[in-house]
Amino acid sequence: MKIRASIRKICEKCRLIRRRRRIMVICSNPRHKQRQG
């Protein structure tokens, strides 16, 4: 899980979702998991 100020999709399978007022990226590749900090 990478925590970044600005998150973006890395590949085509990345999905931007909103959980508990936080924007997150979920992907089939675990290296692409991100959360806005």
From Swiss-Prot:
One of its GO terms (molecular function) is structural constituent of ribosome. GO terms for biological process: translation. Keywords: Chloroplast, Plastid, Ribonucleoprotein, Ribosomal protein. Pfam families: Ribosomal_L36. Coiled coil: none annotated. It is found in: Plastid, Chloroplast. PROSITE patterns: RIBOSOMAL_L36 (PS00828). GO terms for cellular component: chloroplast; ribonucleoprotein complex; ribosome. It comes from the Eukaryota. Its main location: plastid. The keyword Transmembrane does not apply. Belongs to the bacterial ribosomal protein bL36 family. PANTHER family: 50S RIBOSOMAL PROTEIN L36, CHLOROPLASTIC, LARGE RIBOSOMAL SUBUNIT PROTEIN BL36C. This is Large ribosomal subunit protein bL36c. It comes from Cucumis sativus. The gene is rpl36.
